[in-house]
Amino acid sequence: MALLPSLLTALVVYELWPCGALGCDLPQNHILVSRKNFVLLGQMSRISSAICLKDRKDFRFPQDMADGRQFPEAQAASVLHEMLQQIFSLFHTERSSAAWNTTLLDELCTGLLRQLEDLDTCLEQEMGEEESALGTVRPTLAVKRYFRGIHLYLKEKKYSDCAWEIVRMEIMRSFSSSANLQGRLRMKDGDLGSP
């Protein structure tokens, strides 16, 4: 399956990506929580994705999100926050609870909340700087459109097991792509991503 090698590549990039030397300070454990969330998404698989091939869909992940270098730091933090918020909203629903192992789902949602809290602090730091909030509107709208498409897909497929599996794999892809955005943010108390 072509998706697995790209996920593994993204995870390796995520593990090795140097955290930038910019002004947003994230706690040192932020990257560890992010890695754990990625692993939890992998563990949540309940059915073989091979039986869901007919349900595959290109959700059109915003390609400019895959390369975090084109965003100023305030935008990177804002876009990452929006992505994590949308992922949390997707998995923190009654329909999602019915589809997944609730223990893994609860761990994932707790980890996402921790990351969101870290980014809230980061965004508060950035608000005092010159970057205007208007500069973050276009990228965050692209993220919202992307997730709206995922929600519509689930609804069209009547929240079937295969639809949830396809969405889980897509979220893993978008989550691993967010590593580039996280790479723009400096880790407090040392860079875990530095070689």
UniProtKB/Swiss-Prot annotation:
A GO molecular function held by the record: type I interferon receptor binding
Glycosylated residues in this chain: 101
Primary localization class, coarse: secreted
Disulphide-bonded residues: 24-122, 52-162
Keyword entries, A-Z: Antiviral defense, Cytokine, Disulfide bond, Glycoprotein, Secreted, Signal
Signal peptide: 1-23
Pfam families, per database record: Interferon
InterPro entries per the UniProt record, alphabetical: 4_helix_cytokine-like_core (IPR009079), Interferon_alpha/beta/delta (IPR000471)
Protein location: Secreted
Family (UniProt): Belongs to the alpha/beta interferon family.
Protein name in UniProt: Interferon omega-2
